[in-house]
Design a protein with these regions (language model features):
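Short, conserved catalytic or adaptor-binding loops enriched in Gly and charged residues
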Residues: 77-79, 154-164
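Short acidic-hydrophobic, aromatic-tinged amphipathic segments that line or gate anion-handling sites
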Residues: 85-89, 164-180
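Flexible, glycine/charged-enriched surface loops at secondary-structure junctions
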Residues: 42, 166, 192-194
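C-terminal amphipathic helix plus adjacent low-complexity
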Residues: 179-198
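Acidic/glycine-enriched connector segments
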Residues: 23-26, 30-33, 41, 45-119, ...
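Structured adenosyl-cofactor binding patch, chiefly the S-adenosyl-L-methionine
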Residues: 141-154, 167-168, 173
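Generic N-terminal amphipathic, Lys/Arg-enriched alpha-helix
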Residues: 2-19, 29-30, 34-35
Length: 198
C-alpha cells in the first residue's frame, strides 16, 4: 500500500463528558495517527469528535489526517477536528462509504453503528470493537454494539476462509487496537470484486 491506511472510527453520535467511550475514542485517535494511519468517520459529534480531537493531539498529526463523511449537504456541519469534510447529502446511506475503509473500529454505538458494522463485514474489512466495560442497554434494548459483537462473527458465513480465526476482534485499549491493526491489516487488504459477491 503506497498511501497511509484509512481507518474508520464509528460509534455513538453523542457521549457523556469523560465517559469510558469518550476517553477511549480520544486515545484511539491519538494512537492511530501516531502509528501512521488516517481516520475517517461520520464527521459529527460523540465518538467521531473525540477521535478527531485525539488525532489532532498526536505529535505527528498533519492536516488531512481526519476525514469526515457527513450525512448532510453542508460541510459546515462537521465537528472542528475534521480536516476534510465530505458533505454527501446521503443521510444514513453514507455509512457504506465510511465502512468501506481499510479497517473499522467500533466504539459503543446504536443502529447506525450496527449498519456500518454490517457493511464492513459484508465487504470483508478488518473490524475491531471496543469491549465497553460498562455497556448500556437492557434485555429489551440493544446498545453499545461494539461490546455485543466483540470477539464474535456477525453471521455464519465463512467470509474470509483464508484467515484463521476471522471475527470482530475485541479490544480494551487503544494500544490493543494499534497492535491488532499492525498484525491483521495485511491479511484483509484485498476487497471483493463487487458489493454482495462472496
Amino acid at each position: 500500500m503506497n498511501r497511509k491506511p484509512i481507518i474508520a472510527v464509528i460509534g455513538d453520535g453523542s457521549l457523556q463528558k469523560n465517559s469510558e467511550k469518550e476517553i477511549f475514542a480520544e486515545q484511539l485517535g491519538t494512537a492511530l495517527v501516531t502509528a501512521g494511519y488516517r481516520i475517517i468517520c461520520g464527521g459529527l459529534g460523540g465518538v467521531m469528535e473525540a477521535a478527531g480531537r485525539g488525532a489532532h493531539a498526536s505529535p505527528v498529526y498533519s492536516d488531512g489526517d481526519v476525514i469526515g463523511v457527513l450525512p448532510g449537504c453542508t460541510p459546515d456541519a462537521a465537528n472542528p477536528y475534521i480536516d476534510i469534510p465530505i458533505a454527501t447529502g446521503l443521510d444514513h446511506a453514507r455509512n457504506f462509504i465510511v465502512a468501506n475503509s481499510d479497517a473499522v473500529i467500533a466504539v459503543g454505538g446504536g443502529s447506525g453503528t450496527l449498519s456500518e458494522l454490517s457493511y464492513a463485514w459484508i465487504m470483508r474489512r478488518l473490524i475491531l470493537a471496543y469491549r465497553v466495560p460498562h455497556p448500556a442497554g437492557s434485555p429489551e434494548i440493544f446498545a453499545d454494539w461494539s461490546a455485543i459483537v466483540a470477539d464474535k462473527k456477525l453471521d455464519d458465513k465463512d467470509r474470509c476462509p483464508q484467515i484463521e480465526g476471522d471475527r470482530v476482534y475485541g479490544v480494551d485499549t487503544a494500544e490493543d487496537a494499534v497492535n491488532i491493526l499492525a498484525e491483521k491489516l495485511p491479511l484483509y487488504i484485498s476487497r471483493p470484486a463487487c458489493a454482495g459477491k462472496r
